[in-house]
Amino acid sequence: LAIHGINTVEHLHQAIRNGGCIDILRNLQKANLIGSIGFSTHGKSSLIEKAISTNLFDYVNLHWYYINQENTKVINLANKYDLGVFIISPTDKGGHLHTPSNKMLELCRPLHPIVFNDLFCLRNKNVHTLSVGIAKEADFKLHLEAVSLLSESEKYIPKIINRLRQESINVLGLEWYQNWDRNLPSWEYTPGNINIPVLLWLSNLIDWLDMEGFARARYQLLGNGSHWFPGSNANLLDVDVSEGQLLTVLEGHINPKKVINKLRTLKEKFGDKVAKRLSKK
């Protein structure tokens, strides 16, 4: 049984405190009503590491896939503590790979992007399980294809990764590729709670992989995702939040003006609608 959504420090406290969730689950475990105890999370890597380091859990469900490898160190720590690692929604949150862009299809050849991403995840020996939400029957066949190719993953994956990396450098420029995410303010410390790191990531995905549909969905969820997808999108830019305010918190960044221009572009593209989490639809 997994404690669902340890996304904040308060959530973790409620889970591990005396008389909290873990104590209750241990009693159920002793009564042979449940087996292993884990947790799922959309939280920051530092929070997930803190939860793993309590040594109170048997497994963790988290997000990690090719386009978002932020939790790589978390997965390595989970191995140190002998935790099972379950990857949440690698097809959908991994870039809407059920409806991939033509560019993504081309860059992942000879594999379908779903197959590539599955193999990318499972070639990491510290990853044990993927969830495979299926939009259509053909998607399931692609996941089975990935399983059939597990023993051959090294034949395909390094070449595709190199191709994707080179395209990223070609499109974004080497300087931006290497430095775009350095010295960015966290959303909590940004005027309007604008989540600049996530927004720049989405902008990069559009420019690099033509992931406009995925970027639109994530952009429109910001501001409506609570602790599951925290912070706000760029809709407040030039309304309640001025360029000058953002320049102040971006002082250490390699190109603050470029950041703001990218935020404006996202607002122009996607600022007309609000999305809801899947569980709220």
Features from the language model and the residues they span:
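Glycine/proline-rich, positively charged
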Residues: 1-73, 79-87, 91, 109
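Structured C-terminal cap/extension of enzyme domains
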Residues: 73-281
